[in-house]
């Protein structure tokens, strides 16, 4: 993982294929609140979708990675290769885990992201999402935080993913 704010990082393959026991408490809690027809957005390997399916939830996983969608389908969950902003069907629960709010790209995209999400909800539907405050990356030894106020919001990050000889285009993440 390459980013505009830190050294290169590695996400181990086992982390992407976690069991329910291995999930952070926040993700476990979110999964307990899923109900009805559920859309797992940015599903990756499908670890959340698989857990939901095992609990009897009607779940569809989506991701823009064809490879990820193939993996999810092979794991027995219905998955589609589609961009969230192209989804038309309505759902009772929209699930955006592992910093899912980041799909908005930046603060300017947040309003459009939330409007799209709302448009996909059935009556009394819900949006379950998480995000991370990366302020800790700017903390000084004395506990103060140094942020350049003349630049864009510090939570707007550019990423690029690499795996073996494959490299994604750079993308914005909130």
Feature map (PLM): residue ranges:
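S-adenosyl-L-methionine
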Residues: 1-33
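Conserved class I S-adenosyl-L-methionine
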Residues: 33-44
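Conserved SAM-binding loop of SAM-dependent methyltransferases across substrates and taxa
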Residues: 45-56
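Conserved SAM/SAH-binding beta-strand->alpha-helix loop
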Residues: 65
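Conserved SAM-binding strand-loop segment of SAM-dependent methyltransferases
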Residues: 73-86
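A short SAM/SAH-binding and catalytic strip from SAM-dependent methyltransferases
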Residues: 90-111
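A short glycine-rich, Lys/Arg-flanked "PGG" loop and its adjoining helix->strand segment in the class I
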Residues: 111-123
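SAM-dependent methyltransferase
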Residues: 123-174
């Amino acid at each position: 993982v390459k980013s505009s704010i830190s050294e290169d990082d590695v996400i181990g393959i086992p982390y992407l294929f976690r069991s329910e026991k291995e999930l952070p408490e926040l993700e476990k809690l979110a999964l307990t609140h899923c109900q009805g027809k559920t859309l797992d957005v940015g599903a990756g390997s499908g670890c959340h979708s698989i857990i939901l399916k095992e609990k009897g939830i009607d779940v569809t996983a989506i991701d823009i990675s064809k490879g990820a969608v193939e993996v999810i389908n092979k794991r027995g969950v219905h998955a589609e290769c589609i961009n969230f902003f192209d989804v038309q069907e309505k759902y009772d629960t929209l699930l955006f885990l592992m910093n899912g709010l980041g799909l908005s790209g930046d603060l300017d995209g947040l309003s459009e992201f939330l409007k799209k999400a709302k448009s996909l909800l059935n009556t009394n539907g819900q949006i379950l999402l998480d995000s991370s405050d990366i302020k800790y990356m700017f903390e000084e030894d004395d506990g103060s935080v140094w942020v350049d106020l003349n630049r864009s919001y510090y939570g707007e990050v550019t990423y690029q993913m690499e795996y073996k000889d494959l490299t994604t285009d750079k993308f914005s993440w909130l």
